Amino acid sequence: MKIDILTLFPEMFAPLEHSIVGKAKEKGLLDIHYHNFRDYAEKARHVDDEPYGGGQGMLLRAQPIFDTIEQIEAKKPRIILLDPAGKPFTQAYAEELALEEELIFICGHYEGYDERIKTLVTDEISLGDFVLTGGELAAMTMVDATVRLIPQVLGKESSHQDDSFSSGLLEYPQYTRPYDYRGMTVPDVLMSGHHERIRLWRLEESLRKTCLRRPDLLEHYNFSEEERKLLDKIKEALDQGED
């Protein structure tokens, strides 16, 4: 995969040289470039200007963004504008991006964008219902979430398939050694070696956690008959005040 990032602060992306994204680069699975669009700005390298009609703050000018993208060698890239008013970023969207060959991220700054910039983009995406100083942190988050889904980046395919949100549910609780730590013990079912019991326990705990913490995820979840029965059991227990 090839990723190009338009930003005023390329140095902010140093963390992407480490961990999973860094390893993807080392394996030759990822080619990532940072472009300071101030280098392409006319008018004394100014990238912002006052909005027509008045208003608070400054807007990112169209010219530096257009010129930067036009010099990037890409065949048919997915061009993503980081915008608080965009569509929410999700695990499903990250999985969609992981199938692409070329991605371009535009990191904004200031009060907003000249609307004409949006004629370049294929996607307007928001990290969440909050406002950041710029798009850099959002872009780093999206790149990390996407790159780890590229085949061969993680050691095992199942490493990300069991993640929270990949299945549509939150991930079940997990434990490692020792069995007893300060009086807190590992659930007996996980020590049983009984694969079917373990599978059912994990599914039930995943449903329970999702029901308690993110019930909104269940609204559009496609339940199997088994999952529906387990959820009904969980809700009945919760209604009765059981843990």
UniProtKB/Swiss-Prot annotation:
It is an enzyme of class 2 (transferase). InterPro entries: Alpha/beta_knot_MTases (IPR029028), tRNA_m1G_MeTrfase_C_sf (IPR023148), tRNA_m1G_MeTrfase_TrmD (IPR002649), tRNA_m1G_MTases_N (IPR029026), tRNA_MeTrfase_TRMD/TRM10 (IPR016009). It is found in: Cytoplasm. Keywords: Cytoplasm, Methyltransferase, S-adenosyl-L-methionine, Transferase, tRNA processing. One of its GO terms (molecular function) is tRNA (guanine(37)-N1)-methyltransferase activity. It catalyses: guanosine(37) in tRNA + S-adenosyl-L-methionine = N(1)-methylguanosine(37) in tRNA + S-adenosyl-L-homocysteine + H(+). GO terms for cellular component: cytosol. The keyword Repeat does not apply. One of its GO terms (biological process) is tRNA N1-guanine methylation. Its main location: cytoplasm. Coiled coil: none annotated. S-adenosyl-L-methionine binds at residues 108, 127-132. Homodimer. Specifically methylates guanosine-37 in various tRNAs. Belongs to the RNA methyltransferase TrmD family. This is tRNA (guanine-N(1)-)-methyltransferase. The lineage of its organism: Bacteria, Bacillati, Bacillota, Bacilli, Lactobacillales.
